[in-house]
Amino acid sequence: MAGDHEDEFFDFNVSMVSDPLSTFYGRVDTDQMIEEGIHPGDIAVINKAEEPKHGDLIVTFVNNEFVIRFLDLSHLEDHYILLHPSNRRYSAIRINDIENFEVWGVVIWTIKKWR
């Protein structure tokens, strides 16, 4: 807790970001991930150099807007990708044009906004 170790200093960029040149921060502006505990106003720490894998939380650009979703690669043999929200009010986004689909970055941390 703050004040317990006054001589220690926590530097977020050193302690939690392994690749500062490829890391960006974005404010979440959607409720599509609330069941995962990610709410509007939270900050997503995004690494553009990470290779996206099945199940990763990613940021991508779909229908002229940035979206934050879970990447589902289990349908690659059927030539499509799904992007899953974490809010039952929203449906998965199906990506049929996988040749031109681009992940903007992989979310490696989120920072919670309390107020």
Model-predicted regions and their roles:
Residues 1-39, 51-54, 65-66, 75-80, ...:
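Short, positionally conserved secondary-structure boundary motifs
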Residues 43, 68-70, 92-94:
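Well-ordered beta-strand positions in beta-sheet-rich domains
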Residues 45-46, 59:
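Hydrophobic beta-strand signal
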Residues 48-49, 86:
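Fold-independent oxyanion-binding glycine-rich loops
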Residues 55-58, 69:
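Short beta-alpha junctions and helix-cap segments that line functional grooves
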Residues 70-71, 85:
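Residue-level recognition of conserved beta-strand positions in structured domain cores
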